[in-house]
Amino acid sequence: MIHEDDRQPLLTRAFLLAQRLREENKLTKRMRMKQILESWKPKLPPKCELSVEDVEKVGQELSQFTAWFHDAFGRVEPTQLFELHLQGLLSEAERKNMEAIALRLDGPNRVRNLQRLMSEYQWDESSMRKRHWQVAAQSLEDEQGVWSIDASEFPKKGRASVGVAPQYCGALGQTANCQSGVFICYSSPKGHALLDSRLYLPKCWFEPEFQERRKQCRIPEKTTFKTKQELALELLKPLLESNQFGGKWITGDCSFGNTESFLEEWPQDSYYLAEIACTRKVWVKATGISAKWKTEGCTVEQLLKVKHLLNWQTHKISEGEKGPIVAAFARVRVYWSAERTPETERWLLLRNDATHKIKYALSNAPDDTPMKELVRVSGARWPIERCFQEDKSELGLDHYEHRSWTAWHRHMRLVFLAQLFLLCLQIKFKKNACVNPASSTPANGVQFPATQAPTCLSCDPGRLSYTAQRSGLSLPP
């Protein structure tokens, strides 16, 4: 005897036709997405000197590039939305938020889908991060590579976004309502790129009255307060342990260099050149110095009064768009603590550039480190600043309207990938590119990791933003 289940629909002709229509709707949506992805056409100026064949290859490069990240999704819809969002970041749209991208590339019905991509769909974050670093290392790795750490702020008007609070905002130069994140950049003679980030949560976000806001912003329950310096060390550790990137140097500004605990926990087998404030106290090792300064210490700014102590020399830092960039440098061995032990001995590097504002930096590099090496590393601070400037102005780094913890980090990752694609594109064609001819990059450009790539979705050329048109986002001038 067959028992009917009232919860199951009867297999009537009307029901079967409805199911068929539903399947046809799914197929229609997939075909429409395929057409949208295929309609993306590049618009490159003559400055890039790309032939018609090269222009067609741009689409192939994007299709191949995005294919390496398909494994992070597991479903067709989020994979296609990932490609759509990446195209939007690379488009000519003035705003790069989800609504603007959807309206430009597909229409208002796609806005909700992109929102789900950033906040609801499952991503294998670890897999995407691993592949991101793998492709970046293939493009940038060099023994002269330098890591840079820095914070960047994003002004906000409301109070609902994750991590927003009154705090110092570098973008405005004052305390303001904003979010702040810690970022890691890797630079080499081949170019530079942002590789990871972490949103900073001010202490107030861990107070009881913020419990509901933490829940609404989907902050992981086990998240605890950490300083920006602690976040930077957490971000650096897996990158260094991956052994994919050459170079032992790490640079940071005063917000990191002035924190002794941060420098004391520095990763082994690496050197830092960290900027410090002019009021930072040191103990001089050299002779001919006031006995009081040797015992009680002095500020680094006070050392300027001892003329025989500093041997100023002019050095070329890099080649700029308007000619060589030069500055005067001096250095002296100091102790960074009153203990004055060999373990606390450091290089103090002084730099006087065109602004005539002297900058100071400490380094744990060995005593026999050449001056030209310190000069080279001191010039490696600008790549991360340029990344911020160009990613915000061209790739929508600060155009997001997400409020959750997950969406903030996903947005940053997608912007990093868009930036990396532009770098790969420029190295690939080597037209109007500033690539070190002595590098190990093959003559035919970037070679993706030697693993089997997943089958690409239909994703052909499209309109690039002004930065993409220049095809020079990630390379020095």
Task: Identify the residue ranges that each predicted region occupies.
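Conserved, well-structured functional cores that handle cations and Mg-NTP chemistry
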Residues: 34-251, 255-299, 329-334, 345, ...
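Short acidic (Asp/Glu) and glycine-rich catalytic loops that position anionic groups and cofactors
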Residues: 94, 110, 353-358, 365-370, ...
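A short, flexible helix-boundary coil/loop motif
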Residues: 11, 15-77, 201, 208, ...
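Short amphipathic alpha-helical "interface-anchor" segments enriched in bulky aromatics
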Residues: 149-153, 256, 369-402
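Extended, non-catalytic structural segments that build the interaction scaffolds
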Residues: 85, 356-381
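Short runs of predominantly hydrophobic/aromatic residues within well-ordered alpha helices
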Residues: 62, 79-86, 98, 358, ...
